[in-house]
UniProtKB/Swiss-Prot annotation:
Reactions mediated catalytically: [GlcNAc-(1->4)-Mur2Ac(oyl-L-Ala-gamma-D-Glu-L-Lys-D-Ala-D-Ala)](n)-di-trans,octa-cis-undecaprenyl diphosphate + beta-D-GlcNAc-(1->4)-Mur2Ac(oyl-L-Ala-gamma-D-Glu-L-Lys-D-Ala-D-Ala)-di-trans,octa-cis-undecaprenyl diphosphate = [GlcNAc-(1->4)-Mur2Ac(oyl-L-Ala-gamma-D-Glu-L-Lys-D-Ala-D-Ala)](n+1)-di-trans,octa-cis-undecaprenyl diphosphate + di-trans,octa-cis-undecaprenyl diphosphate + H(+)
InterPro entries in the cross-refs: Cell_cycle_FtsW-rel_CS, FtsW, FtsW/RodA
GO biological process: cell wall organization; FtsZ-dependent cytokinesis; peptidoglycan biosynthetic process; regulation of cell shape
Primary location recorded for the protein, binned into one broad class: membrane
Protein name: Probable peptidoglycan glycosyltransferase FtsW
Protein task: Peptidoglycan polymerase that is essential for cell division.
Pfam families, per the entry: FTSW_RODA_SPOVE
Enzyme Commission code(s) on record: 2.4.99.28
Domain of life: Bacteria
Length: 387
């Protein structure tokens, strides 16, 4: 049991092995997510394509591509990503800008968040999250002393402001919230002064609240969250249907594949509200199992970050912390939205929800975390065997 609370058990070995707790939790979440995507999408896939298993195999292909890409990323030294950080940031901003250009960006449900690349769609906001974390990790290493000055503190804030503005123009308010919270966490762990941190948190929180207050549809989401049953057939529809799914699941669920809510009652059943369908089919026990897997995953990520910090691998530490904050926060928000304790944000559940960009990028994020662990515990092996 003590091995679960440590990352040092395999340091003396000659063969590099990944953190099995982290890898096991990630694989379990992906596997369970794949099964639930197939179950939750049966009705909509049959209606749209005449093939009930369409999204099951589509998501399986994305996961396969994600795993292949992740393996390639895992084989590359962290120093490469550290040097490439500024270029990746510019690429991310450029992709976000392209989504706003008519004829290039693809509009769905009033939001222009995708780029059409032949038969597939790329969601730049997912790449922007990853690229921002990589860039900030390198910045905190290069400017470790300057971060404690107002100038060094404000520079990454300005970078975030550019990305945040482009995301708001899509609009993608949920991605802005996740990026802002990740920025706050990384700056705080990177040694920023407490008063700088508190001031940014207050100003950022006030700005996000103002955006919600002066945006009619965001305000409608907030009011419907506070009392979804006041308008269960309009503004509160998604949340009430999700709550019905949770109620039907009871302790052990209605059985895999037996959800009623996925039959066109619950919108986005295979993406944003996958967890509600899971709760209906697998019950409270299944819901708690998912939460437990995420807790194990994030805990191990933070342990890896702490081990890298103690080993003097600062970039790896910041990278692990940043990726952990991002994935953990997005999972927390999605689960909270599904359970009705947070307003609707339109964020997918990492490692589980359907979506090509989200699945592949999250697999890459896991690979980077495992790379941090590898270079921390097996520095000689990493230098010798990985180029």
């Amino acid at each position: 049991m003590s091995r679960f609370f440590s990352t040092r058990q395999a340091v003396g070995g000659s063969t590099p092995q990944p953190d099995l707790y982290l890898l096991g939790a990630a694989v379990a979440l992906m596997g369970l997510g794949w099964v639930m995507v197939g179950s939750a999408s049966v009705a909509i896939a049959d209606s749209r394509f005449g093939q009930p298993t369409y999204y099951l195999w589509r998501q399986g292909l994305f996961l396969l591509l994600g795993l292949v890409t992740a393996f390639g990323v895992w084989r590359i030294r962290l120093a490469f990503w550290e040097k490439l950080g500024p270029v990746m940031l510019l690429l991310g901003l450029g992709l976000l800008l392209l989504t706003l250009i008519p004829g290039i960006g693809v509009e769905v449900n009033g939001s222009r968040r995708w780029l059409a690349l032949g038969p597939i769609r790329l969601q730049p906001s997912e790449l922007a999250k990853l690229f921002m974390v990589i860039y900030l990790s390198g910045y905190l290493v290069r400017r470790s002393a300057e971060v404690r000055t107002i100038r060094g503190f404000l520079f990454p804030v300005g970078v975030f402001a550019m990305a945040g503005l482009l995301l708001l123009l899509e609009p993608d308010f949920g991605a802005v919230v996740v990026l802002f919270a990740t920025l706050l966490g990384m700056l705080f762990l990177g040694g920023a002064r407490l008063w700088h941190f508190l001031l940014l948190a207050a100003l950022g929180g006030a700005s996000l609240a103002a955006l919600a207050w002066y945006s009619p549809y965001r305000m409608q989401r907030l009011t419907s969250f506070l009392d979804p049953w006041a308008d269960p057939l309009n503004s509160g529809y998604q949340l009430t249907q999700a709550l019905i799914a949770f109620g039907r699941g009871e302790w052990l669920g209605v059985g895999l594949g037996n959800s009623i809510q996925k039959l066109f009652y619950l919108p986005e059943a295979h993406t944003d509200f996958l967890y509600a369908v899971l709760a209906e089919e697998l019950g409270l026990m299944g819901s708690l199992a998912v939460i437990a897997l995420f807790v194990v995953f994030i805990y191990r990520v933070l342990l890896i970050g702490r081990a890298a910090e103690r080993a003097g691998r600062t970039f790896g530490a910041h990278l692990a912390y940043g990726l952990g904050i991002w994935i953990g926060l997005q999972a927390f928000i999605n689960l909270g939205v599904n359970m009705g304790v947070l307003p609707t944000k339109g964020l997918t559940l990492p490692l589980m929800s359907a979506g090509g960009s989200s699945s592949i990028v999250t697999c890459v994020a896991v690979a980077l975390i495992l790379r941090v662990d590898l270079e921390t515990r097996f520095p000689k092996v990493a230098r010798r065997s990985v180029k």
